[in-house]
Amino acid sequence: MINDDLIVLLEPIIKNMGYELWGCEYLSQGKHSLLRIYIDKPDGIGIDDCQEVSKQVSAMLDVEDPIPGHYSLEISSPGIPRPLFSIWQYQRYLGYEIHVKTFKPVNGKRKLSGIIVSASEDTIVLDINNEHQEILLSNIVKANLTV
């Protein structure tokens, strides 16, 4: 999980460039680690946008060095199966269907799909087959909009 301090470092730089910091993932796979930063803007993200943000963020990360060890930096658009990281993103997509993977089972399942009915500070409520299911945000490993 990405440290909030890293978000605090990244957000002003990305925002000042005219983009929205959509979210971050840090994937550690043995010797190869990856810091993936998702950016967005109303008219979409292109390769040039990713390159521009990569240069600025890379320079800041080299100076601040918030992540120990070696890793690759990737700047990306959230894409079509858009990942959801923050409560404001769940609120933005009320009424949309999402896929959710949880740490602990919810009603015996760790993979759920449903329509976002509500999103509060620490929980979301999904409509799954006309039944409301509350899921703690702290229990969500990954959530994506359904394509």
Swiss-Prot record:
GO terms for cellular component: cytosol. One of its GO terms (biological process) is translation. InterPro entries: Ribosome_maturation_RimP, RimP_C, RimP_C_sf, RimP_N, RimP_N_sf. CDD domains: YlxS_C. It is found in: Cytoplasm. Keywords: Cytoplasm, Ribosome biogenesis. Belongs to the RimP family. Required for maturation of 30S ribosomal subunits. This is Ribosome maturation factor RimP. It comes from Legionella pneumophila subsp. pneumophila (strain Philadelphia 1 / ATCC 33152 / DSM 7513).
